[in-house]
Amino acid sequence: MSEIGSYHDTIFALSSGRLPSGVAVIRISGPKTRFVYETICQAIPEPRHAALLTFRSRNGDAIDRGLILFFPAPHSFTGEDCAEFHLHGGKAVVEKMLAVLGELPGCRIAEAGEFTRRAFANGKMDLTIAEGLADLIAAETEGQRRLAMQVASGNQRKLYSEWRQRLINARAFIEAELDFADESDVPGSVSMQVWQQLSALKHEIEHHIASGKRAAMLRDGLHVVIVGAPNAGKSSLLNFLAGRDVAIISKEAGTTRDLLEVKLDLGGIPVYVTDTAGLRETDSVVEKIGIERARARMAEADLVLSLEDMSGPVSVTVEKIEAETWLIGTKADLGGSASGLWKYHISTMTGSGLEQLLDALQAFAEAKIGQIEDAVPTRQRHINLLRATIEEIEKAIEGDDLPLELRAENMRLASQFLGRITGDVDVEEILDVIFSQFCIGK
């Protein structure tokens, strides 16, 4: 990736979806954008107005006929001169157009996320908005889309900028007391008010971090693990939840030996359900490995569904784990006298109890996530920097025996950590990581 500020070349990339398609969009950004469209279109389109033109190579051969739009700097996505070619989405058409663009001097194919990185470099967005756009592109459920839109709309940026300004103002009061301690127009000992304000800010940030766990669940998904003895109906339940045959079903015990995972969309919340090897004593080395993996996945679960065949002898045993566990009686169509032992009774043969269980899973997911309406930290990077901010605030508040100069320095560091979240202070070392998450063309 080029260094920020050294964008002397013009970049281009296919910004629309997979080919072939009805329409393909090729985006261009950089100082030679005007030269590019004048060369290919032999015309100068009016800014922000679509023009229907023929696209030609440098030797005059027609490539396609389509629309071009021009967005002059600084009022464009990247802050540079930008253009979009809208052409037919045939593979040969797009490949020819990209080849022609690549032959123009000063033009090259864009790297992943480079358009967005240029937008950041030119002050069109901060890092949290860029991350929100990445999450919006990756969103697969309605809940993920809503969360990503909150971030991409700038809610995080506004909150963190406000907190940072409060720290800067508080530090200014302390430095004023240091510089003008003998002056009559400086209020007597404003520092006590400052420490109270910092304490309130610390509690706000702590509450904000706590809400991040729910956001992480929505962004990364909840994890439900199905466990039980061999032939308890685990694979049959997984197939029902998936709506297709994911797992092999057999009367032979020990058929499932590895982890099988499906992703569900329950009310806009991503939920990953994992089928595991049957828990039992075995001499099979392969099956033992599967059982070890099952127990490891259980330890990471948000919810465990412990299945037992209701038609056989009752021997309900639950592995000792921290996650919430539901006891599920299976094969309810075959009967069972001890049905009160289980939270739910299901039969994949008749469908009995399955919709009730599915509704319960959705209710569980919704209760775990709750309503996320305010700005929340959506990435571990945010949480790490927020914790570092709190640590410096605590040092400033609790440093009664320290000189005010040192406590003011703690406040400066705290505001710097907040600034690193939004990119207001130097974050060069993490930019490649953030923008590499985008596809080429974004």
Curated annotation (Swiss-Prot):
Co-factor binding comment: Binds 1 potassium ion per subunit.
Residues the record lists as binding Mg(2+): 235, 256
InterPro entries: G_TrmE, GTP-bd, GTP-bd_TrmE_N, GTPase_MnmE, MnmE_dom2, MnmE_helical, P-loop_NTPase, Small_GTP-bd
Domain of life: Bacteria
Binding residues for GTP: 231-236, 250-256, 275-278
Cell compartments where the protein resides: Cytoplasm
One GO location term (cellular component): cytoplasm
EC code: 3.6.-.-
The protein's enzyme class: hydrolase
Main subcellular location of this protein, as a coarse class: cytoplasm
Domain spans labelled TrmE-type G: 221-366
Protein family per UniProt: Belongs to the TRAFAC class TrmE-Era-EngA-EngB-Septin-like GTPase superfamily. TrmE GTPase family.
NCBIfam families: mnmE_trmE_thdF, PRK05291.1-3, small_GTP
Subunit structure: Homodimer. Heterotetramer of two MnmE and two MnmG subunits.
Protein name: tRNA modification GTPase MnmE
